[in-house]
Amino acid sequence: MKFNYKNICLAALAACSVTACDLDTAPTTSLEANAVFKNLENADRVIRGAWNYIFNSGSTYASIGYGAIMINDDFAGSDVVRTTSYGYSSSYKLTNGYGRGEINDVMWDMVYDPINNCNAVLKNIDGISGDQEEKNRIKGQAYATRGFLYMLLASHYSFAIDKDPDAVCVPIYTEPTDYDMATTGKPAASVSEVYEQALKDLKWGYDLIPTDYNRGSNATDQYKIDHIVVTGLMARTSLYARKWEDAYKYADEAMKLKNNYLMSEAEYKSGFNNALNKEWMWGYSCTLDDNLPAYNFYYKDTTTPGGGYTNFNTDPHFKELFDKNDYRRDLFKWGLNTGYGECAMLNYKFLFADINNMLGDVIMMRVSEMYLIKAEAAAHLAGKTSEAQALLKELRDARMKEGFESPVVTATGDELLKEIWLERRKELWGEGFSLTDIIRNQQSVDRKKYEEYAMADITHDSKGQEIRTPKLDENGDVILAPEDATDEYKEQNCMLISGHSTLKFPDDSDFEANSKYYLFRITEKEELQNKNLYNDHPKLSIYR
């Protein structure tokens, strides 16, 4: 990776040339700000350049952009099982953050480089002549992008805001970084201050981006932040910051802007690869000329023939959490992954749109998240318990097979919150929320051993090598060996199937809440270069 990019140059903020892909950029360190910001089109290109970096930066194929952060966060949670292959071992074993692994360091640059882009836009755009509404839109998107990035930092580099609002988090930069600042650095702010900055930026974006701004119907434009997206980000960030009234208000508004649309069963089972899906609020679409972010599907798609690493599999205990008539349950089945032929509970939720051309869109926000945010916020607000229950049931009903209805929700208080958190795990599985939810709710990773003998279909490949595949019943569930099966019977007719392989923290201690192994960690380079880092707030005791 390049320099730690709160850093020295105008570099990636600068020369973006729009060619085959709207996000194509050609960074240079030699361009001065007055040359870059001579018109609104160039300012807009700087924002597009920031998003290019967010989606495409990384150090290896196992750390490509924001999609890799989302994969990391789910591997570090309770419900994704990593099978043997390249990539994300440290994420699954929970050594990435505390041990300063690859994803940990990539995240730092992935966030602070674009923040510097946004700061440059905000410093210079008022001096550019042009249409005021267009200027407001670009300025609003710069604020919203920066707010989104500070939300990412606040939710990954510190424990929950209510655990210790004054705990150290990360530095806040709101001006372009010059040489002096890059070589000295700013003190790290507290987690509450970082959330405050995120919300302030997002509110500016909310106020400035015109409500009638239309990013168009092209899939490749769906990453652009419009009024719906910034409203959703206000809801998400308010939830993380435990501002329940705001979370409720903005989630409700976002739902209405999308007509409360929830996917049909057919749409839900279509592969989560299309940014034009009517429930999606925000997504990134790859093209033939810009498909690097879709490389992440080589991990997440475990079933398409010709797949790559196929290691993003499912905890068998997780499937048991679904109602028998919940169609989401159908997305998790035992089988042999297509990359390595390893037996696992595969996921059918994420599929390449076109594996031959490495195409598939990245989901970043959809309406069901807004339902869950509104329900969780309502559960915290006086007099809104029944509304929280109704919202939870409405979402569950939308995920039931035709002709079936979910049970009435009767839980209240903490039990209702637990049901909502569980529904987040079920509905948003694989979409990058696991680790953040564990941190912000002060919960623990929950992984249990799973090991059973299943009946096997036995075939042979062209070389005569035996292949055993778990037998499934008509409901897609594995057929287990008889309870009285002898060892000889199992050897002849069965196969051993298993779930999680990592069941404790790296130091062999049991999983618990508020562990140092959940957090991302300020990079060693930053600690060495930034002499002011801990001037205002002391280093977390877990690192001392």
What are these regions (language model features)?
Residues 3, 20-70, 322, 403-404, ...:
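Membrane-proximal, proline-rich intrinsically disordered regions
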Residues 47, 115-118, 195, 202, ...:
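Inward-facing hydrophobic residues that define packing positions of alpha-helical scaffold repeats
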Residues 85-157, 189-192, 206-211, 357-362, ...:
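Conserved, well-structured interaction surfaces
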Residues 33-34, 61-78, 157-173, 211-296, ...:
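Short, surface-exposed recognition loops and adjoining beta-strand edges that mediate ligand/DNA contacts
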Residues 224, 248-367, 401-407, 413, ...:
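Hydrophobic-face positions in mid-chain alpha helices that act as interaction patches
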